[in-house]
Amino acid sequence: MKLVVSTTLPLKDYRGIEFSKDKKDVQIFRQVHGIISDSWLVDRSNKVNLPFASVALPEYSLNFPIKNIDLDTACFNRSKELIASNKKIYVLWSGGIDSTLTVVALLEADIPKDQIYVVCNTDSLKENYNFFLKISDRVNFVSTERVMQILKYDNLDGMVLSAEHGDLSYGYDFSSEMLQILGPDYLKLPATRENIVKYFTHKKLDVESANCWYDVFMESAKNSPRPIDTTYDFSWWAGFNWRWQYALEKFRMRFYRIPDSTTFFIGQDIQNWSIHHQQPDLNNLRDFKPEYKKIIFRYTGDEDYYKNKIKHESTTLYYGSNSYAAVLENQSRIHTKDFDLFSYYQEDNFINQWICR
C-alpha cells in the first residue's frame, strides 16, 4: 500500500536523523524540506520515484486534452461545471487573491444565492472587508469554526470548495522566493543547473543535494506539457507537478470522513490556462497574479486592491493540529500515534540511482 500524502515531521526530528544515517538517498530527500516546507511531494507525471512509496491518484492526472484558453473563459467554464452539480458549495474564503477570484467567478456565472455559502472568519474580513460588504447580499455566510467542527465528525450537506492550486497554477511558491532572494532578472534566466543550484544552495541545501534535486525536477520535466526553459518555468513545474496532489489532500487528511471536496483551480480548463500562460514581468510581490486581480477588479472596482494586493498566508482559515499523519491509496487514514513513515521506504528510487550513476 502506497502513500497519497504524509506528514513530513518524522523526517525533521531524531527519527529522520537516525533512519538516514546509512541511507544517503534519505539524507538528500530530507534536505528538500528546507525549500518546500511541509509539502509531501508526489510526481503526478509518474516519471520519478522518490525514497518513500507514494502514488499519484487519477484525480490529479496530467492526461487530459491540452488546449490554449484564456483565464476568463476557463473560470466561467469551471464555475458553470460546479454550479451544474446542484450541490451547495461551501467556498473557503480567506480574503486572499485566489479565494476571492473563486467567489467572483462563481458570482459572475450567476450562481444562485441558495447554492453558495462563503466560509470565513475574522481574518478573512480583516484581509478584504470591502469585498465582504460587496457580496453580502448575494451569498450566504457561515463561520469557519462551525464548518470545521461539523467536518470533524460528519459531512456537510454539500461540496467544500477551496482555492488551493491557485499559487501552483501561477508558479508562485519558488518564484516569489527567487524574486526576493536573487532579484527579478533571475526569473528570466535559463533553467540551467548552475542557476537552479544557486537558488537551492541559498536555501541551505548542500551542493550535492542541490544538484540531485535539480536532476529530480528536470527528469520529471520531460513529461511537462509546457517547456521548462526559464527559472520561472522551473518554479511553475515544481508546484504544478510536485505539490499538486498535496494541495488538496492535506485538507482531506484532517477529517474523520473524507469530505466532498475539490478546488476551483483543479478544473482542466484552468490547468490548461496555467500551462499556456506567459511569464509576467515580475519586479516585486505586487506584480504576481495580475490576471487574477484583473478579474477581481472588474467585479469590485477596487483599484487599490488591484494595484497593491500581495499574497498573505491564509492558514488560519482551516488549518491547525491534525490527528492523522497519512492517507493511503485505499483512502484509509493513519493516526499519528500509529504511523511509521519509514516502513514505506523503497530502496529502488531515483535518488539512489543518481548516487550510483
Language model features with spans:
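Nucleotide-activated chemistry modules centered on ATP-dependent adenylation/adenylyltransferase
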Residues: 2-68, 72-88, 105, 117-357
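Conserved G/P- and acidic residue-centered "switch" motifs that form tight phosphate/ATP-binding loops
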Residues: 96
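Short, electropositive, low-hydrophobicity segments enriched in small/polar residues
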Residues: 99-100, 167
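Active-site signature of alpha/beta-hydrolase-fold catalytic machinery across serine-
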Residues: 101-108
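Phosphate-handling active-site elements
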Residues: 110-116
